[in-house]
């Protein structure tokens, strides 16, 4: 079972421009596949720092590097993983529930915008990879 890895996907947002500059548009339940409950952004991270390192039971995310670049490693707990490079302000990545995420290789000017489907709840975060793998295996054995 691919535990939501098949739902991970890159998103392209509309860019509207004129001589004054550009606007990127992303609306809930259109380009963003959920209603946004929380917005935060990551900046000032060094290239060798890894952020994230967790999976979520309930929260979906869209990540957009609105400035600079970073990479996102996504794992399913069954040995499958993919790496995505976020380096354009009009593209993002959709991360469903129950995928392990690691953000890293931040450029000095990186600003990573994070859109979340749920308000913050520390109890729905899985911060130990071994525990995540066990949960994935348990879920598979129940299906």
Regions found by a protein language model. Name each.
Residues 1-91, 108-109, 115, 121-131, ...:
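Non-catalytic, conserved peripheral segments adjacent to functional cores
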Residues 88-92, 98-105:
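Well-ordered alpha/beta subsegment
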């Amino acid at each position: 079972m691919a535990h939501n890895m098949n739902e991970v996907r890159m998103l392209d947002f509309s860019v509207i421009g004129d001589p004054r500059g550009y606007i990127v548009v992303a609306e809930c339940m259109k380009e963003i596949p959920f209603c946004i409950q929380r917005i935060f952004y990551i900046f000032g991270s060094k290239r060798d720092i890894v952020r994230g390192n967790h999976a979520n039971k309930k929260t979906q995310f869209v990540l957009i590097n609105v400035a600079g670049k970073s990479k996102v490693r996504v794992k399913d707990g069954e040995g499958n993983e993919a790496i995505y490079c976020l380096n354009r302000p009009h593209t993002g990545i959709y991360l469903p529930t129950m995928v392990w995420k690691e953000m890293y290789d931040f450029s000095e000017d990186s600003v990573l915008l994070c859109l979340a489907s749920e308000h913050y709840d520390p109890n729905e975060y899985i911060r130990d990879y071994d525990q995540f793998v066990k949960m994935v295996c348990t879920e598979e054995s129940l299906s």
